[in-house]
């Protein structure tokens, strides 16, 4: 949420026009700008293991519940990302299905796992995590938040994730600044 304080004689900022009226910027769109996972330019890897929750919390969407230990949830590659928190790092880092990322026709594993849990309850919990599930890289988090590719981040990996999560996404900041500029300068 943005709160703007502008004198009444300076005009009222209008909400920005959506920057993506016909096509939302999806997680897949953001990640497709980067080099292949694990190669230079996309190799600030998170080493936290992914383990399923012993007592998963289900929501209607497989991307909304707590199906894994920690606060890192799987990202829906076909939708805009939820806000990336400053607490990313370790098991709070979002999860990517690398197989579904590389092959868009393949349904993400999380969908079938969620269906099993929804249908069969706790008896469907598995500890067998497929090797193609992985954590988001620093570069991927930055791309999702619309930072320029190749931007340098400081400190250890957890500090880099915190910088990305604490910042206003650049495209959002630009849209808000333009709305204020238009209100003040016409």
Give the predicted meaning of each segment.
Residues 1-186:
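S-adenosyl-L-methionine-dependent DNA methyltransferase catalytic core
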């Amino acid at each position: 949420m943005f709160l703007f304080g502008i004198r009444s004689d300076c005009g009222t900022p209008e909400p920005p026009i959506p920057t993506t009226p016909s096509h939302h910027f999806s997680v897949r769109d953001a990640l497709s700008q980067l080099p292949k996972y694990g190669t230079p330019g996309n190799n600030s890897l998170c080493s936290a293991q992914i383990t399923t929750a012993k007592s998963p919390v289900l929501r209607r969407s497989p991307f909304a519940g707590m199906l894994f230990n920690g606060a890192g949830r799987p990202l829906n590659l076909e939708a805009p990302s939820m806000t990336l928190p400053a607490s990313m790092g370790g098991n709070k880092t979002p999860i990517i299905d690398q197989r579904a990322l590389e092959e868009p026709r393949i349904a993400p594993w999380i969908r079938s796992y969620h269906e099993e849990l929804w249908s069969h309850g706790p008896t469907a919990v598995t500890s067998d995590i497929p090797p193609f599930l992985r954590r988001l890289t620093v570069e991927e988090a930055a791309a999702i938040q619309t930072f320029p590719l190749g931007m340098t981040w400081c400190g250890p990996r957890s500090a880099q994730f915190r910088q990305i999560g604490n910042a206003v996404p650049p495209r959002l900041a630009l849209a808000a600044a333009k709305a204020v500029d238009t209100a003040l300068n016409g």
